[in-house]
Amino acid sequence: MAGLPDRDKLIRNFSRCLNWEEKYLYIIELGGQLAPLTEQQRHPENLISGCQSQVWIAMTLSAEGHVIFAGDSDAAIVKGLVAVVFILYHDLTPQQIISLDVRPFFADLALSQHLTPSRSQGLEAMIRAIRTKVANLSAH
């Protein structure tokens, strides 16, 4: 997660944005900080269904049992939302990710009411897919 802020800094930075245009630009900037995916990570099994844009999310377990994320999207704002999700789940174990309800966090940022319905549905699809995949990660 090199380059991405931690959860508290994300909230601080987001609150400093004066309007939604600045917040969107900040989200896009976060997406630009994601490391590029390898061709292997762009495998169809990492493609998230339910998103209007193409979204890939790859996950592995660290030696300490924390989930390591890699992701990308063909849409700049969605790539930024991927980065926001990764910030929320950073340094967590599969069980912690499954237990964590991120919806209140999105409500605090007022993301839900400022995203189009299709983007909100895509965000929900991303969260569901991550929870399903981490459950499979911890089972292996």
Curated annotation (Swiss-Prot):
Disulphide bonds in the chain: none
Alphabetic keyword roster: Cytoplasm
InterPro entries registered for this protein in UniProt: Cysteine_desulfuration_SufE (IPR023939), Fe-S_metab-assoc_dom (IPR003808)
Domain of life of the native organism: Bacteria
Gene Ontology biological process terms from the UniProt entry: iron-sulfur cluster assembly; sulfur compound metabolic process
One CC-aspect GO term: cytoplasm
Biological pathway: Cofactor biosynthesis; iron-sulfur cluster biosynthesis
Compartment list: Cytoplasm
Pfam families, per the entry: SufE (PF02657)
Major location category of this protein: cytoplasm
Catalytic site positions: 51
Oligomer status and interactors: Homodimer. Interacts with SufS.
Similarity remark: Belongs to the SufE family.
Function: Participates in cysteine desulfuration mediated by SufS. Cysteine desulfuration mobilizes sulfur from L-cysteine to yield L-alanine and constitutes an essential step in sulfur metabolism for biosynthesis of a variety of sulfur-containing biomolecules. Functions as a sulfur acceptor for SufS, by mediating the direct transfer of the sulfur atom from the S-sulfanylcysteine of SufS, an intermediate product of cysteine desulfuration process.
Record-given protein name: Cysteine desulfuration protein SufE
Origin species: Yersinia pestis
Annotated gene: sufE
